[in-house]
Amino acid sequence: MFKKFDEKESVSNCIQLKTSVIKGIKSQLVEQFPGIEPWLNQIMPKKDPVKIVRCHEHTEILTVSGELLFFRQRKGPFCPTLRLLHKYPFILPHQQVDKGAIKFVLSGANIMCPGLTSPGAKLYPAAVDTIVAVTAEGKQHALCVGVMKMSAEDIEKVNKGIGIENIHYLNDGLWHMKTYK
């Protein structure tokens, strides 16, 4: 999603949100990520300005005080950015890939089923369309944020094809966009 993303070319406008809209977004985030509720006031303080950065391809990025926190496409579910995920790793369920998949994931490739079922990988139960953090064998922080294209049981049974769609990874355009004022 952010492979060819460039801050100067891809951003179309930025809108400061009203408090009523912010409350709606917060309740949507709590519904989507139940573990985030105790930390939500720390992530999104009440007095800090909350803005939506609108980008090409119907992508919206939620920012608080210039810090990029969540993104979504076409009014879909919110996904945390990797910077936020590194601070609060418990927001998303995790899947682990083996060492051989690291360079492909960091170049933006989708995660294939064999990379999730081989020795060194750990596949945790997850349903289709679940947003997950993908970590690597022997690494502490997440490599990418992805969407499960198959359930964990189907990945183990079929062991072919795309298991997780890579939507945001380290060193992509969104990662290089540090803050937005």
UniProtKB/Swiss-Prot annotation:
<dbReference type="GO" id="GO:0003723">
    <property type="term" value="F:RNA binding"/>
</dbReference>
<keyword id="KW-0963">Cytoplasm</keyword>
<comment type="similarity">
    <text>Belongs to the MCTS1 family.</text>
</comment>
<protein>
    <recommendedName>
        <fullName>Malignant T-cell-amplified sequence 2</fullName>
    </recommendedName>
</protein>
<dbReference type="InterPro" id="IPR016437">
    <property type="entry name" value="MCT-1/Tma20"/>
</dbReference>
<dbReference type="Pfam" id="PF01472">
    <property type="entry name" value="PUA"/>
</dbReference>
<dbReference type="InterPro" id="IPR002478">
    <property type="entry name" value="PUA"/>
</dbReference>
<dbReference type="GO" id="GO:0001731">
    <property type="term" value="P:formation of translation preinitiation complex"/>
</dbReference>
<dbReference type="GO" id="GO:0005737">
    <property type="term" value="C:cytoplasm"/>
</dbReference>
<dbReference type="Pfam" id="PF17832">
    <property type="entry name" value="Pre-PUA"/>
</dbReference>
<dbReference type="InterPro" id="IPR041366">
    <property type="entry name" value="Pre-PUA"/>
</dbReference>
<dbReference type="InterPro" id="IPR004521">
    <property type="entry name" value="Uncharacterised_CHP00451"/>
</dbReference>
<feature type="domain" description="PUA">
    <location>
        <begin position="92"/>
        <end position="171"/>
    </location>
</feature>
<dbReference type="InterPro" id="IPR015947">
    <property type="entry name" value="PUA-like_sf"/>
</dbReference>
